[in-house]
Amino acid sequence: MAKGTRFINFRRYGRFGSRRYRRFGSHKSVRKIPRGVIHIQTSFHNTIVTVTDGRGQVVSWSSAGTCRFKGPRKRTPFAAQIVAADAIGPVVDQGLQRAKIKLKGTGRGRDAALRTISKSGIGFTSVQDVTPVPHNGCRPPNKKRQ
């Protein structure tokens, strides 16, 4: 017996497949962001880049973990470069032209992230270091023994 065509239950799946697999367009309109603030937070173990608009609402963000870096690779300058490019990509498409940059932390990825942002074509209005400095507060962690 020859193979017949497969029966599709249109009552269940509708004419064009189940609703689960249909793609609906977003009803949100794309915002134009001429100015914003880029926060670069670097620690000894990770780099996080957050882009906010003028009112402080987060537009885009990325970290070394979300860019699929694991373990000791998260702290490298290359990871910071990829993180900065990943966070800035959607915002450049939305028309970001000028941004304040706020650097926090003393990690290795500070300069790499800053270089990547400058190559992306976004102009800097100011670069500000907002690293919290204690006035003899908590005792720092012990140095690693080798």
UniProtKB/Swiss-Prot annotation:
Spans annotated as Disordered: 126-146
Transmembrane segments: none
Statement: the UniProt record of this protein carries the keyword Ribonucleoprotein: yes
GO MF annotations, alphabetized: rRNA binding; structural constituent of ribosome
Entry-linked Gene3D superfamilies: Ribosomal protein S11
Entry keyword rRNA-binding: yes
Pfam families linked: Ribosomal_S11
Annotated compartments: Plastid, Chloroplast
A single GO BP: translation
NCBIfam families the record matches: PRK05309.1
Protein name: Small ribosomal subunit protein uS11c
